């Protein structure tokens, strides 16, 4: 028999015995001690808590399950309207996008930030057909999330399921406390007068009302109050400075006008009833009025004298007093007649005090 034929008759099977665990060096550290197996299971259980899973959490309270349960930590209104599917996800590993509240590249649920892009809560008809040419510049909402998570529509209507709602992200309110009441004005028109407080609004209406009476001292009080209110509503520091400067300028003009008219009245009426010195110095030393004054004040010198030139009124000094004394002496004392001895001395006007001017 040939050697090759001897192997053709039978096929021997080799049996390898199992390696004893006591001699295995790779598991000796875990199973060598009596507590090794339990510690390994605890480590795996702790690790399982941080891995994504579709199984419900056995430790969760069934009474807390619902649309606003603590399982979803992102249920506040602000996060849902401005952060949900808007902020980019920072995770590096692959995970379930439907359970992640953040946006991912190429995700259909991605939303535009309503604080940066001005679009309404109305669904875009072109996007429903399949494609919108305007893209992110469109003024309408693209998709269900942009439409119902828009600040103008989110939780403005009650949920038909109420407390029995099991949606992970629900766009509707489940209790009266969750219903959001929208203001009357548009969110884009934050600078309108509708957002002003009732007190400021009434003050603004009173300031522009034609029946409002201005104070007698400030004839432009209504316009000043209107400008001041408008500057506060716009929040402009430059406007406040300009309004304050205009108000101070107006008050200074009013004070100057009142002071000038008061001095003219006192000077005019005092010339006939006051001391003769005041009456003599009236036409020569009267200051230039800042505003036109009414004629007709009593002054005994205005009937016989012409108005002094402007340059003469602004001059001052000893030379002016000498010229004034000479002029007064010629025009008022040349025609004076010596007193009659029979008449009393009280009828003669005393002008001796004029000599004090040249001293």
Curated annotation (Swiss-Prot):
Keyword set includes DNA-binding: yes
One of the protein's GO biological processes: response to oxidative stress
Gene Ontology terms: cellular component: plasma membrane
Any Pfam family matching the protein: zf-CCCH_AtC3H23
Annotated spans, Disordered: 207-226, 334-359
Gene3D superfamilies per the UniProt record, alphabetical: 3.30.1370.210
Entry keyword set: DNA-binding, Metal-binding, Repeat, Zinc, Zinc-finger
SMART domains: ZnF_C3H1
Residue spans, zinc finger C3H1-type: 75-107, 119-145, 153-177
PROSITE patterns in the cross-refs: ZF_C3H1
One MF term in the entry's GO annotations: DNA binding
Top-level taxon: Eukaryota
Keyword Repeat: yes
Protein name (Swiss-Prot/TrEMBL): Zinc finger CCCH domain-containing protein 20
Species in which this protein is naturally found: Arabidopsis thaliana
């Amino acid at each position: 028999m040939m050697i090759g034929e001897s192997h053709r008759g039978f096929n021997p099977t080799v049996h390898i015995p199992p390696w004893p665990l006591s001699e295995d060096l790779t598991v000796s550290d875990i199973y060598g001690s009596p507590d090794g197996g339990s510690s390994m299971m605890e480590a795996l259980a702790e690790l399982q808590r941080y891995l994504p899973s579709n199984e419900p959490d056995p430790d969760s309270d069934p009474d807390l399950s619902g649309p606003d349960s603590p399982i979803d930590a992102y249920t506040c209104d602000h996060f849902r309207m401005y952060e949900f599917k808007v902020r980019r996800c920072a995770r590096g590993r692959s995970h379930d996008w439907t359970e992640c509240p953040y946006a991912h590249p190429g995700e259909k649920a991605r939303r535009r930030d309503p604080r940066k892009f001005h679009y309404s809560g109305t669904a875009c008809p072109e996007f429903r057909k399949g494609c919108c040419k305007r893209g992110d510049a469109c003024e309408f909402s693209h998709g269900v999330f942009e439409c119902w998570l828009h600040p103008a529509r989110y939780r403005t209507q009650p949920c038909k399921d109420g407390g029995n709602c099991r949606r992970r992200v629900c766009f509707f309110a489940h209790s009266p406390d969750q219903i959001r009441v929208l203001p009357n004005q548009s969110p884009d028109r934050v600078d309108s007068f509708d957002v002003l407080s009732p007190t400021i609004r009434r003050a603004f209406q009173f300031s522009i009302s034609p029946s409002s009476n201005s104070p007698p001292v400030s004839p432009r009080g209504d316009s000043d109050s209107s400008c001041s209110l408008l500057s506060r509503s716009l929040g402009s520091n430059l406007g406040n400075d300009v309004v304050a400067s205009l108000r101070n300028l107006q008050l200074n003009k009013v004070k100057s006008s009142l002071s000038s008219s008061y001095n003219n009245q006192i000077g005019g009426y005092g010339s006939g009833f006051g001391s003769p010195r005041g009456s003599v110095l009236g036409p020569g030393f009267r200051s230039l009025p800042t505003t036109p004054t009414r004629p007709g004040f009593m002054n005994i010198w205005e009937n016989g004298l012409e108005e002094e030139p402007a340059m003469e009124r602004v001059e001052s000094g000893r030379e002016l007093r000498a010229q004034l004394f000479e002029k007064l002496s010629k025009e008022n004392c040349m025609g004076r007649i010596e007193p009659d001895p029979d008449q009393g001395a009280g009828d003669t006007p005393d002008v001796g005090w004029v000599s004090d001017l040249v001293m």
